[in-house]
């Protein structure tokens, strides 16, 4: 498309850097298997009208990474992620004063709360739990929860290793899981 051509030209980058091959699938199961790396999709609950919705289990050389996908409280994730090396989980949150307002509650019904995420982490016991895709809701006079408030809420119910993902953060999965924050540019 023209946008890609312009960006490639402006930045003097080869077009092959943006080539991508997609493969659509309509049911859960193994979606990739090459050289010992397997990716298996599984269905997750993101609400009655948001289907299908997928999570992913990635396995390689005895290591396991699970991505919940954008989901509400779904304990299938906990079972699939049992004793994984790394569990990425989405989250939605609002302060107590506004979480039951109709518009806020409607959005939260499609997401896992911090307390629910803590229960999933406690049950699955990953080497590292990582919060991704945070839907943080607020209203005038009621700002969204801060990342510190999110961490404190989760740590009230879960005492394992935990971090909140940032763009360009890297993870090294081995005997231990190492977090490498994005490089300062």
Where are these regions (language model features)?
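Binuclear metal-dependent hydrolase catalytic cores
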Residues: 1-65, 145, 149-178
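Generic secondary-structure boundary signal with a strong preference for alpha-helix termini
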Residues: 81, 178-179
